[in-house]
Amino acid sequence: TLAAYRLLFGLLGLLPLAWMTGQAIPRDGGLLIRFLGLAVLNTALPFALISWGETRIGSGLAAILNGSTPLFTLIIAHFWLRDEKITPRRAAGLALGFVGVVVLMSRDLGSPAALGSPWGQVAVLAASCSYAVAATFARASLRGQPPVLQATASVLMADAVLWLAVPVAEWPPRLPHLPGTWLALGWLGLLGSCVAYLLYYYLINAWGATRATIVTYVFPIIGLFLGVAVLREPLTAQLVAGTLLIVTGIATATRAPAART
C-alpha cells in the first residue's frame, strides 16, 4: 500500500510535466505492452520483492544484494545489446564498486539476525535481477522514447498494478494517519519516483543500461553521509574506504575508452 501511495505522489509530478511537454500516453498496442512490461519489471515487481524481503533480512545485507544490479545488467546486456559488451575495464570497475558497497554495509552484518531468511535474500536478489532485465529491456525496446514518456507511462502502469495487488496482499489497505507519514510519502514520491525515474531513463538513453544502473552504488553513500551530517553519526575509516572504492569503480566503469591513433 505504501509503495502504491508513493507512486501516486510520483504521478502528481510526472503527469503535469508530461502534459507541459506534449507527451501523451501512446495508443499503439505494441508500445503499450512494452511500457507495461517495463512497469512490472522496473517498478511493481522489484518494489514488492524488496518490501517483502526486507522484512526478513537486515537492511545492510539488502543494500549489498541490491548492489548486484549493475553486475546482473553487465551480463544480461552483453548477450542482449550489441553495443554493451563486457570489457575488462567495465567488469573491473563494476566489481570494484560492488566491493565498495560491501565495505560500506558490512558493519550491519555482525549478527546472524542480519542475514535473516534465505528466502528474503532470494527475494532481494530477484529484485536486483528484475531491475537489470528492465534496464536492458528499456535500452533495447524503448530506445529513442522521451524519458518523460517512459517515466510517466511506466509509473502510471506500475501504480495500477500495485493497487490491483493491494486487495490480495494486504486487506484492508492501510491508510496513513500521521501528517508526517504523508509528508514522507510525498517526498519519496516526488523525489524518489518522479525525479529519479526521469533521470534514470535519461541515463539509459544517453549512457546505456549497464552504466545507468551504476547509480545503485551511490545510494548507500548518500544514506550513510546523511547519517553523518544529520544524525551526527561518526565518520569512520570504513565509510571513507567504501566511498573511495565505489567512486573509483564508477570512474573506471564509465570512462570512455581511449581513442586509437
Where are the regions a protein language model picked out?
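Helix-helix packing/entry segments at the starts of transmembrane helices
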Residues: 3-5, 43, 59-68, 136-160, ...
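Specific transmembrane alpha-helical segments of multi-pass solute transporters/efflux pumps
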Residues: 14-66, 102-103, 189-207
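Cytoplasmic-side transmembrane-helix entry/capping segments in multi-pass membrane proteins
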Residues: 30-39, 85-98, 145-154
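C-terminal transmembrane-helix exit sites in multi-pass transporters
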Residues: 15-25, 70-95, 221-240
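Membrane-interface helix termini and inter-helical loops of multi-pass transporters
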Residues: 52-56, 105-117, 167-184, 228-237
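Hydrophobic/small/kink-forming positions within alpha-helical transmembrane segments
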Residues: 15, 39-44, 48, 71-75, ...
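Transmembrane alpha-helical segments that form core, pore/gating elements
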Residues: 14, 73-75, 79, 94, ...
